[in-house]
């Protein structure tokens, strides 16, 4: 048998740095490394670097949210309405590779988390962003990644849909930022006090909105140029059973064009539902920037919703034109369409030069002219995190007033919003109603 001589360790030239056994070293092992003996019982586990980075990003997002919430509270207490005021930070954001950063964040979001850590991470997120975990359709342990958790479905019945046929419902959970009526071609939507953008720029040059605007404007202009015709008693009819005067405008109702902007916070439910029964005729994908969409960004970045990446669904419902724009943001570049799973947003090959993105990618759904029929409340899309949805739609506009003997009277919109700016709303709740006409 061969013998091996074991040499004693040479003295260290730096005694203070010499390796010495620690009498309590067995009490200070890393929590993420098991010894050989304990490994047989518990298994070895090393925290992935991607998971650690995800936790760090989670902490940063939480701190940023707390800071922004405090600023919002202070402004509300002072009664100050946010105004548009560009700053250096907004200009600096254009220099950052936000699209690449968002793709990296998306990769981190897809990292599978250890089963025993999932409840703790998801509960921490829920506390930070006010999410209701009781509505989740599955136990927390069954969501393998943060992305799966963010786009989670809800328990059946969590979002009852208003069944009134004369109403539109909210497509998302979120905060109502802006709402109103568009009057005439080229009408602007207010982004924030002091700055507006056109609905045509948001939806695209080939949008069917242009035809709806021109038709509505032409009808209104014709009525204003012939006021005598609308007041003439020859238009009235009398019911023999119950004498009553009817105005011709009630027999031939007009259509108005309305809009509603809803912001989804990171803690909100992230799926987009259909606001009405409608036919989705075309899809338009704009490859753009991925600026953030928090309150600071809204009041400092020009054309925020127009420049950001977005997917526009456009079609027809029983009252006319309707469109939904799902707008991406930093870390939310991926917009998923359930009616078109193959669509990919925030693609690496997309180029944006001199703030001019590539032309939009259009698709007309088959059968042409009919498209895809979706019911009110049906899921149609989803975000990875918080973002913004803009609805533009036609709704009935008729005269509720009766003309007096002197020919005077008032004209009001038959469609009324049930909500106002600043309200919190959930999927399925009515955003507006109109009265039935005989």
Curated annotation (Swiss-Prot):
Cofactors that this protein relies on: pyruvate
Mitochondrial matrix face residues: 22-48
Quaternary assembly: Heterodimer of a large membrane-associated beta subunit and a small pyruvoyl-containing alpha subunit.
Gene from which this protein is expressed: PSD1
Keyword Lipid metabolism: yes
Lineage: Eukaryota, Viridiplantae, Streptophyta, Embryophyta, Tracheophyta
Protein name: Phosphatidylserine decarboxylase proenzyme 1, mitochondrial
Annotated GO MF terms: phosphatidylserine decarboxylase activity
Record's keyword terms, sorted: Decarboxylase, Lipid biosynthesis, Lipid metabolism, Lyase, Membrane, Mitochondrion, Mitochondrion inner membrane, Phospholipid biosynthesis, Phospholipid metabolism, Pyruvate, Transit peptide, Transmembrane, Transmembrane helix, Zymogen
């Amino acid at each position: 048998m061969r013998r091996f001589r074991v040499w004693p360790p040479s003295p260290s030239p730096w005694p203070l740095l010499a390796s010495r056994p620690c009498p309590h070293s067995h009490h200070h092992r890393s929590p993420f490394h098991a010894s050989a003996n304990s490994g047989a019982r518990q298994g070895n586990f090393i925290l992935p670097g991607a998971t650690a980075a995800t936790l760090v990003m989670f902490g940063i997002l939480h701190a940023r949210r707390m800071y922004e919430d405090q600023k919002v509270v202070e402004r509300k207490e002072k009664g100050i309405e946010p105004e548009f005021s560009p700053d250096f930070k907004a200009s600096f954001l254009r220099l950052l590779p936000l699209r690449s950063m968002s793709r990296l964040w998306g990769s981190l979001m897809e990292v599978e988390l250890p089963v025993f850590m999932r409840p703790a991470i998801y509960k921490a997120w829920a506390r930070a962003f006010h999410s209701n975990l009781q509505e989740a359709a599955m136990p927390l342990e069954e969501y393998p990644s943060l992305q799966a958790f963010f786009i989670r479905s809800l328990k059946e019945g969590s979002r009852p849909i208003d069944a009134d046929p004369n109403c539109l419902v909210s497509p998302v959970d979120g905060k109502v930022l802006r709402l109103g009526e568009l009057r005439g071609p080229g009408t602007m939507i207010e982004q924030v006090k002091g700055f507006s953008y056109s609905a045509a720029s948001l939806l695209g040059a080939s949008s069917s909105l242009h035809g709806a605007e021109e038709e509505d404007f032409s009808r209104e202009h014709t009525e204003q140029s012939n006021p005598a015709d609308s007041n003439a008693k020859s238009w009235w009819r009398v019911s023999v059973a119950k004498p009553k005067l009817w105005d011709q405008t009630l027999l031939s109702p007009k259509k108005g064009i309305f809009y509603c902007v809803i912001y989804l916070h990171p803690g909100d439910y992230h799926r987009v539902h259909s606001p009405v029964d409608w036919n989705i005729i075309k899809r338009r994908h704009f490859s753009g920037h991925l600026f953030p969409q928090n309150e600071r960004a809204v009041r400092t970045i020009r054309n925020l919703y127009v420049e950001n990446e977005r997917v526009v669904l456009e079609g027809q419902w029983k009252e006319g034109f309707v469109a939904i724009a799902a707008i991406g943001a930093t870390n939310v570049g991926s917009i998923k369409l359930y009616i078109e799973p193959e669509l990919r947003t925030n693609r690496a090959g997309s180029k944006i030069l001199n703030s001019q993105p590539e032309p939009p990618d259009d698709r007309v759904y088959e059968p042409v002219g009919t498209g895809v029929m979706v019911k009110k409340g049906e899921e149609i899309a989803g975000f990875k995190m918080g973002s913004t949805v803009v609805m533009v739609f036609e709704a009935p506009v008729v005269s509720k007033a009766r003309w007096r003997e002197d020919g005077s009277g008032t004209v009001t919109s038959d469609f009324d919003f049930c909500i106002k700016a600043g309200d919190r709303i959930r999927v399925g709740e009515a955003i507006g109603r109109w009265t039935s006409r005989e």
